[in-house]
């Protein structure tokens, strides 16, 4: 549902943020 979509978007953003820091 909507909550799952929000969690997926948040996880994607967090992963991208961490990847940006590490690289």
Curated annotation (Swiss-Prot):
Superkingdom: Eukaryota
Any one GO CC term of the record: extracellular region
Name of this chain's protein: Dahlein-4.3
Swiss-Prot/TrEMBL keywords: Amphibian defense peptide, Secreted
Organism: Ranoidea dahlii (Dahl's aquatic frog)
Entry comment describing in which tissues the protein is expressed: Expressed by the skin dorsal glands.
Compartments, as annotated in UniProt: Secreted
One biological process term in Gene Ontology: defense response
Role: Has no antimicrobial activity.
């Amino acid at each position: 549902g909507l909550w799952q979509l929000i969690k997926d978007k948040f996880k994607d953003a967090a992963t991208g943020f961490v990847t940006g820091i590490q690289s």
